[in-house]
Amino acid sequence: MVLTSDHLDKKNIRKIEYKGEDSFSNSMSKLPLQGGMSDSIFMASISDFSNWSRLSSLWPLLYGTSCCFIEFASLIGSRFDFDRYGLVPRSSPRQADLIVTAGTITMKMAPSLIRLYEQMPEPKYVIAMGACTITGGMFSTDSYSTVRGVDKLIPVDIYLPGCPPKPEAIMDAVTKLRKKIARNRFVNRASRPIRTKYFSISHQLNLVPGTCAGKYNWDRENCGTKLAPANFSENCQKFANEHDELKSAI
């Protein structure tokens, strides 16, 4: 996006093609030229300049709740070095524009996740990492405390399946997110609607009788006959009378 002396060469003017605002490219050879311009200025629209600066400096908020976060932690090392993508992990949601949810989301953690997402400034992006985050994973069938998909709580931009995803797949997801940010338009970007908080929704629970609860219910209803027989009170009174007679005789 920076003009250099090579672009101002008259021989290269015919080779340069103009690229509209609907698409974005980091290449410096796709910009229109005007005579007499300096080689130290930017030639870009507001949308392209905003997207270029944002995709080059994503600040993620790491939200790891399970084993998938171990794979993301390996990106910090020298082997993958995610600093070359401009990723700077932040501990405060007010300083982050990307949240990476890695692991199982439980019912108790759902309000905290939504609160963190709402504290992030716009524009903000979400990467759902791992099968447990996307669909609930192995807990999606018979778990009473697992949220079956983080997209039921917050909007998701990139889905990254796997159990767990490899670090290479995580970098590919970051690359795809950068391409998505590059295609956004600043003037037409609509703010996401304010949704009802998760912890304020009244759940509609349907009680279903269990198939193996018959014996338990029968034992519960008849436990009085086993522990307290019908003549239990009479035996207690008889024992008390015998104790009083024995005490008076002594």
From Swiss-Prot:
Gene3D superfamilies: 3.40.50.12280
Membrane topology category: Peripheral membrane protein
Catalyses which reaction(s): a plastoquinone + NADH + (n+1) H(+)(in) = a plastoquinol + NAD(+) + n H(+)(out); a plastoquinone + NADPH + (n+1) H(+)(in) = a plastoquinol + NADP(+) + n H(+)(out)
SUPFAM superfamilies: HydA/Nqo6-like
A Pfam family this chain is assigned to: Oxidored_q6
Binding locations of [4Fe-4S] cluster: C67, C68, C132, C163
Swiss-Prot/TrEMBL cofactor(s): [4Fe-4S] cluster
Record GO biological process: aerobic respiration; electron transport coupled proton transport; photosynthesis, light reaction
UniProt key word Ion transport: no
Keyword S-adenosyl-L-methionine belongs to the record: no
EC number: 7.1.1.-
This protein's UniProt keywords: 4Fe-4S, Chloroplast, Iron, Iron-sulfur, Membrane, Metal-binding, NAD, NADP, Plastid, Plastoquinone, Quinone, Thylakoid, Translocase, Transport
Single Gene Ontology MF annotation: quinone binding
Cofactor binding description: Binds 1 [4Fe-4S] cluster.
Classification via InterPro entries: NADH_UbQ_OxRdtase-like_20kDa, NADH_UQ_OxRdtase_20Kd_su
Compartments, record wording: Plastid, Chloroplast thylakoid membrane
Predominant location category: plastid
Superkingdom to which the source organism belongs: Eukaryota
GO cellular component: chloroplast thylakoid membrane; respiratory chain complex I
Family: Belongs to the complex I 20 kDa subunit family.
Matching NCBIfam families: nuoB_fam, PRK06411.1
Purpose of the protein: NDH shuttles electrons from NAD(P)H:plastoquinone, via FMN and iron-sulfur (Fe-S) centers, to quinones in the photosynthetic chain and possibly in a chloroplast respiratory chain. The immediate electron acceptor for the enzyme in this species is believed to be plastoquinone. Couples the redox reaction to proton translocation, and thus conserves the redox energy in a proton gradient.
Alphabetical list of PANTHER family matching this protein: NADH DEHYDROGENASE, NADH DEHYDROGENASE [UBIQUINONE] IRON-SULFUR PROTEIN 7, MITOCHONDRIAL
Known partners and oligomeric status: NDH is composed of at least 16 different subunits, 5 of which are encoded in the nucleus.
Name of the protein this chain belongs to: NAD(P)H-quinone oxidoreductase subunit K, chloroplastic
Organism: Adiantum capillus-veneris
